[in-house]
Design a protein with these regions (language model features):
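Hydrophobic transmembrane helix segments
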Residues: 16-48
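Juxtamembrane helix-break-helix junctions at the cytosolic face
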Residues: 63-82, 100
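Non-cytosolic membrane-interface motifs at loop->transmembrane helix junctions
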Residues: 39-43, 74-80, 106-115
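Hydrophobic alpha-helical membrane segments
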Residues: 80-98, 118-124
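Membrane-helix boundary connector in multi-pass membrane proteins
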Residues: 93-114, 133
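Hydrophobic transmembrane alpha-helical segments in integral membrane proteins
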Residues: 2-21
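Core segments of alpha-helical transmembrane spans in multipass integral membrane proteins
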Residues: 19, 24, 46-68, 85-92
Length: 144
């Protein structure tokens, strides 16, 4: 498995990235009340919180599929990794943009986690796209 990920470094980055996704999936879907209370969002935010948690669940399941089940492993999985990177980047940029737009959604419980977590996830997913390029873009290289 280590060779599949071009060494231990990218395997660890993959595990850390999707462990973060699994953490937020759990918090949003199964621990919704504690999550919305932690950030002072109120019970009305539960539905949309679970909606976004569901997106994390799907990504974690796909990552587990690529890691353990898919016969090709990482080969040709460029669309998944690029989608993950773009989602992370968009969440990071939107959080920065929203911060500049004013105080909507901020309260005494708001933390910088809303900026830091997407930034870290964006960096990790960019590293995965770069470090695994020879594997994930394999089918695209053969088509040329």
């Amino acid at each position: 498995m280590i060779d599949e990920f071009n060494g231990i470094t990218y395997l660890v980055i993959f595990i850390i990235h999707f462990a973060g996704y699994a953490f937020y999936a759990f918090r949003c879907v199964l621990s919704t009340k504690a999550f919305v209370d932690q950030y002072g969002m109120g019970d009305g935010a539960a539905i949309i919180t679970r909606f976004f948690g569901g997106i994390f669940v799907g990504s974690v399941l796909m990552a587990l599929n690529i890691m353990f089940i898919r016969s090709e492993g990482l080969e040709g999985s460029w669309a998944f990794f690029n989608l993950i990177f773009l989602q992370n980047l968009c969440v990071f940029l939107v959080s920065l943009f929203a911060n500049r737009q004013g105080s909507l959604g901020t309260n005494e419980k708001t933390s910088i986690e809303g900026y830091i977590a997407p930034g870290v996830l964006t960096l990790l997913s960019a590293l995965l796209c770069y470090g695994l390029a020879d594997k994930i873009y394999w089918n695209l290289i053969l088509c040329k």
